[in-house]
């Protein structure tokens, strides 16, 4: 019942640009599967235009699994900076490690994203965010932590994570 209320038919005269533009940033050379799975989920859940900024070694696998996706090399910092404003949603972190490269990508997103964009921070980007005491870029920022990442973000030990305690940190 919930799915039927959330999913509607597309208009006959609509085009893919009407259904959102999403940029996914992640997928280190040895972890390309995570960003490809995230891009697939984004596409199959209805996003109109999906662009994946990832390591160049993931390009062939990306196109073989998701030919409708667009590719950007996440090491092309200038292109990343200039393209960020064209997306409605920016996802950063699937298939990344807590390292300087992820931190650079995350800081680029934080510095160049607009208040109108949604930012989803996942995976290694969560650990980078927590470890470097970065500021939340805007009110439309979403974190997707598992228990250990939530411990890093909130300072609450895994054994003490309870709904009411977690909520206090969020308020």
Q: What are the residue ranges of the model-derived segments?
A:
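Small-residue (G/A/S/T)-rich helix-start motifs and N-terminal tracts that mark the onset
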Residues: 1-119, 127-142, 147-171
């Amino acid at each position: 019942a919930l799915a039927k209320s959330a999913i509607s038919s597309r208009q006959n005269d609509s085009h893919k640009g009407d259904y959102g533009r999403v940029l996914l940033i992640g997928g280190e050379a040895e972890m390309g599967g995570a960003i490809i799975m995230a891009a697939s989920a984004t596409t199959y859940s209805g996003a109109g235009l999906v662009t994946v900024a990832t390591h160049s070694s993931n390009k062939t696998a990306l196109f073989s699994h998701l030919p409708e996706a667009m590719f950007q090399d996440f090491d092309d910092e200038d292109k990343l900076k200039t393209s960020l404003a064209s997306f409605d949603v920016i996802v950063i972190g699937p298939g990344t490690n807590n390292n300087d490269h992820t931190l650079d990508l995350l800081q680029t997103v934080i510095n160049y994203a607009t208040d109108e964009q949604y930012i989803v921070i996942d995976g290694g980007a969560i650990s980078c965010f927590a470890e470097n005491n970065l500021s939340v870029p805007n009110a439309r920022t979403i974190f997707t932590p598992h228990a250990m990442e939530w411990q890093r973000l909130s300072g609450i030990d895994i054994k003490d994570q309870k709904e009411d305690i977690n909520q206090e940190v969020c308020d």
